[in-house]
Amino acid sequence: MTDPLAAYQLAKRRGMDFIALTDSDSLDGYAQLAQFADVIPACETTLQFPEDGCPVRVMVYGLNDAQLAKMLSLRGNLYNVREYLLAENLYHVVAQPLEPHDGKLSPDHVERLLLLFDHFEARSCGRQQRSNEFTSAFLDALTPEYFDQIQRKLKITPASERPWQKGQIGSSNDYCGQYIGLTWTEAPRVATAGEFLQQLRMRKGTPAGMHGSTIASAHSMYRVGAQLYASKVLRREGDVQGILELILTRLLSPEKPTKMQVAGSLWDALKNLFKMRKKPSAIERKLIAETIRAYRELPKDERLGGIDRDDLQTFDARLYNMADRVLSKVSYQLLNDAMKDFERGQIGSGLPLVAALLPIQSVMAPYLYSFDKLNRDRKLIRELSARVEGTLELPKKSARKKVAWFSDTVTDVNGVSMTLHRMSEVAEKLDADLEIICSVAESRAPTGSKFLNFPPVGEISIPDYELQKLSVPPILRIVKYLESQNFDEYIISTPGPVGLIAMFAAKLFGVPVRAIYHSDFPQHVRQITGDEGLEKTTWKFMRWFYGLADAVYSPSDHYRKQLIDHGFNPRRLFIYTRGTDLDFYNPRHRDEEFYKPHGITDRVIFVYTGRVSREKNLDVVVDAFLQDEVLQRKAALAIVGDGPFRDELIARKLPPMIVFPGFVKGKQLAKAYASGDVFVFPSTTDTYGNSVLEAQASGLPSLVSNEGGPKEIILPGESGLVLPGYDVNAWRQAMRSLVESDDLRHRMAAAARARAATRDWSTAFREFWDEDPYPKADEEVRAIVIA
């Protein structure tokens, strides 16, 4: 795509003494510059291993047209090409030696390449710093002993007498005309291009200059689009995708980006739009408006104007952030408007908005493709490192495990949030290398040192969960961060937007995943909607999402069995044991005055804490209370918490011994537990039930349903009772028995505290952090394949 003369002039302006244009299978670029003595004839071609067709790219220098033609005639057999290049004494280099172009490249192929070739591209502007540095370190680590070993194994004659001493070069790997001369090869000062090549043959070249990045790779694609646009090839239809592509490609034109160019690009898009339509659609108007708004909201030092034309790294980073804002904001607005239409029953209005999300997301394709392309070598690098371990001295990776934990909920009143905060506190004390990644409004962001919040583009209300919001995270920003951090493991607590991004990144970067099945979403959906079809659809999503994980953790054996019944692989299912703060939740926090402001004195107090919502089955406990005269005379029921079902219960005008203290936290929550006498938790959908464990630690016997995970927290008949979830009479009788027998209540209270004492957070964290479930899961996969 790049004009040879323009490429030559740019390289000279950037300080290059000699220049080689490595066109694919052609010397046409060189032919147009042959009059310049500092230009080296060169080309790049793709060779193949004849045994399996695995492709390998090779750059050849100093050749003529006849030699090129002969080489191309042999390229189906890499071995024959190698022999021809040696016979013709042509300087040649393996390009991007660890890039698995079609997924076939393996450590076996790399060992063959090491024997066959003496020169390798160790720094490429088309590869990331991580890849380049490993390539260089690997080549530097080669030894005679290693070559003896692989030569005996492969029976290949090395290219030279000292094959462990490899020549290394750097190259721009540019195909859009922007990165020329930013990566190069240095050699001792010489007078002619021929002498320079001779220095490289003698392995005296040193790669230098910038490394590539996924952002630069994506923008290269857009820059090619800019050149197509300038050539009138870019399609001209007036739709959302075309408009945004037009804006991006205009911003990525080869000229120096200025404030006027940014404004001009947006204006060109508007003019193009009005030429194509008499009246632009609402979506197109929104796209342009959001683009302009996003740019105006950028701080001045983050805008595109005023950047030196050679400072492409700064420009690329700023444009990436801008594209992230634009795409995220427009997507959020469309999704939010669609949700509002659906809530109003206007399905016909909402569906086109949802459909419009697809072309907008496709504009991200160059970014997503680049994330994939530039990270495909991670698996090969891991395999190669494992193969030479103990043979070659490569830079040691830190033995300290680095983990990213993802959750869509971190500050809400639920077990997931509470668990994450407790785990983060233990991680701080133990100095574990853990980051908990979330996306919530900055006003609600957690402040702990282990939390990393990416402010969302917006938030969407969840039906029947007015107190909770579904965040729309900045996808590109999160993925770029994850790429840069090289985490050893991902842990995913929720299958929401943040969890989906984490799973996507895990597949891109080859990171193992542990996913925790915290919430029984299918049953929640059925209870909220009454629609069994939606419940089945939710199960399909759960199987798909958790099926992508390497290991899945269930909070209880009950839910492990349920997941198996719904098609989950039993060998990939593990139990996730949580803990509690035994000092914080403690009987000593009992305060006889705590419930007095609510009119409760001298009664046996039944306590519920948590979210007050329909799926918690609280009406069973309320009805049981209302149907028993002894309970109304001697007991009280305190429903502590907030939620959409609270107002419905209050509206029933319940008797005064049923009270609603509202939402409490911190020390007040500890007192709310300890100041009660019995804990009730009738939910049939909770996968675990943190509040049950907290109540047990506070010295309260617990009444729980026979469905869900909480029944596994108590010792039935000792620290509490397990009751049929929807049997009001069974709950009434159990509650009455505890009111009428102080001895039974006190005995169960002591057993509850003793039961909880075995489950502190430090133990729970260490067990989970140190567990390695992957060998077991991999073993099962191998067993299935063999069988």
Predicted feature residues:
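A metal-dependent hydrolase metal-coordination microenvironment
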Residues: 1-89, 130, 137
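Conserved donor-binding/catalytic core segment of Leloir-type glycosyltransferases
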Residues: 405, 599-626
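Conserved acidic donor-binding segment of nucleotide-sugar-dependent glycosyltransferases
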Residues: 716-717, 721-728, 737-742
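Aromatic "clamp/platform" in nucleotide-sugar-dependent glycosyltransferases that forms part
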Residues: 684
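Nucleotide-activated donor-binding/catalytic signature segment of Leloir-type glycosyltransferases, i.e.
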Residues: 647-667
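Short hydrophobic beta-strand element within catalytic cores of glycosyltransferases
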Residues: 701-704
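Domain-core and long-helix interface of multi-subunit machines
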Residues: 1-2, 65-185, 211
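Short alpha-helical donor nucleotide-sugar binding micro-motif in glycosyltransferases
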Residues: 664, 671-676
